Structure formats: structure tokens, C-alpha cells
Amino acid sequence: MPFSVEVEVFFLLVEDKLGWLPTLQPVRHGSKAVTRHRRVMHFQRQKLMAITEYIPPRPAVSPRCLPPPPKPPKEESGLIRLLRRDIAAVFRDNRMIAVCQNVALSAEDKLLLRHQLRKHKIFIKVFPSQVLKPFLEDSKYQNLLPLFVGHNLLLVSEEPKVKEMVRILKSVPFLPLLGGCIDDTILSRQGFVEYAKLPSLDRLQGELVGGLTHLTAQTRYLLQHQPVQLTSLLDQYVRQQHEGDCATSTEGKPHPPDPAPDS
């Protein structure tokens, strides 16, 4: 292979200055290496290669990656069925249902609160959430579900004793009222407070009866006023006619002669 003389002289000079170096160093001359480009495959061969392409089989799925087999439905215990019946009876027989947060009350405070509410026939009911929530999901009270977070208790009564309940709960500030429903109408905490400001039912009934009585009396007066006035006018007309006839008959008769004076 030919070598360049200039390169050989260069290496000799470097050897004198730096020490021992190889005296000969091959240097390649000539054209560059030819880079072969990949030839485009004929379209028929492309089809054949695509058809005959090897498709490896899918690896077998480990049994641990498969979903577990469905478990048989769990049968409800007798306690769950009993609690479900109690919950259905509470929501069916009571018109007022209030939801409160079940905070950690002492036994004495809880007994005092229960006694104060029982005076007004308001009762405290506590049910587990895993039984109460499925009942609400399948009933018309499903909009109450957002109130049941954590531990809750229910204040129920057959009549809406909202004023008494709000007054008692104000004395227990650490027992928050979340909301509830009255006569199947959902109310918030502010709704209960506004409902408590309404007058009592007896007072409203008295005002209604008084208003109806006043309207009845006014209607009776209006119905009798015209006939009475017409009757009085007719009586006055008859009396005037009678007085006119009497005056006419008196003017038509001759005056009796004056009696002769005694001689």
C-alpha cells in the first residue's frame, strides 16, 4: 500500500522532539467508501412480506392478573332486616325528620338532651350508615344522602315541632343541625330556622276563622242592606201617600155651620 512521504517526514520530526514513535504510519488515500442505499422493495414483494409476516403468539395471562370470580351474594342477617324495617317505619310515621351530626356527647349531656326533646315528643334515632344509606338510595328521600357524612343521628316527631327543636338545639351549640325534611319537603338548616319563626297552627287557624267570619258578616250586611233600604223607602212612600189622601179628603168636605148664639 502506498504511503505519503510528507507524513513519514512529519513522524520523524515528532520522534526527535517527543521520543520514540512508530516510523511508519499508514494513511489511506483515494475515494471515500461507497455507502449502499437500501433498495426499494417491489410492491408485490411488499404484499408477500406483509402476508407472511410472523405474528408471535400472545403471552399467556397470569392467573393473578385475571379478575376474581364473582362472589355469591351475601345474605342479610336478621339484624340488618330488623334495622331496615325500623328505618322504614321512622320515615313513614313521622312528619318531621331532622339530621344532626353525632358528636361525642357525654352520657349526662345525651341523657339531658333526650329528656328535653322527649317532653315535646321529639325522639332521637341512631342507625348505622351501612343500613341507612342503601335505604335512602332506593326511596324518595335520596336527596338527603349528602347530609349523611360520618356519624349522624335523627330527630323525629309525628308533628312538626320545629320551634321547640330549634330552641333546644340552640342550648347545645356543639350538636350542629345539618338539615332534614318536613312533610316530604327538604329543608336546610336555615330553612328550619325560618320555619320556626312562623306562627303556630292554632294561631293561623284562629286568624283564618276570624277573617272568614268577618267576610261572612260583611257579605250578609251587603246582601241585606239593599232590601232593607228598599223596604224603608216603600214604607215612607206608603206613609206619604196615606197622609196625602187624608189631606185631600179633609179639604173636600164642607165646614159645619157655626152654632147660633144664645139669645
From Swiss-Prot:
It is found in: Mitochondrion. GO terms for molecular function: structural constituent of ribosome. GO terms for biological process: translation. Residues 1-29 form a transit peptide. Gene3D superfamilies: 3.30.70.1730. Residues 241-263 are annotated as: Disordered. Its main location: mitochondrion. Keywords: Mitochondrion, Ribonucleoprotein, Ribosomal protein, Transit peptide. It comes from the Eukaryota. GO terms for cellular component: mitochondrial large ribosomal subunit; mitochondrion; nucleoplasm; ribonucleoprotein complex. Component of the mitochondrial ribosome large subunit (39S) which comprises a 16S rRNA and about 50 distinct proteins. Belongs to the universal ribosomal protein uL10 family. This is Large ribosomal subunit protein uL10m. The lineage of its organism: Eukaryota, Metazoa, Chordata, Craniata, Vertebrata. The gene is Mrpl10.
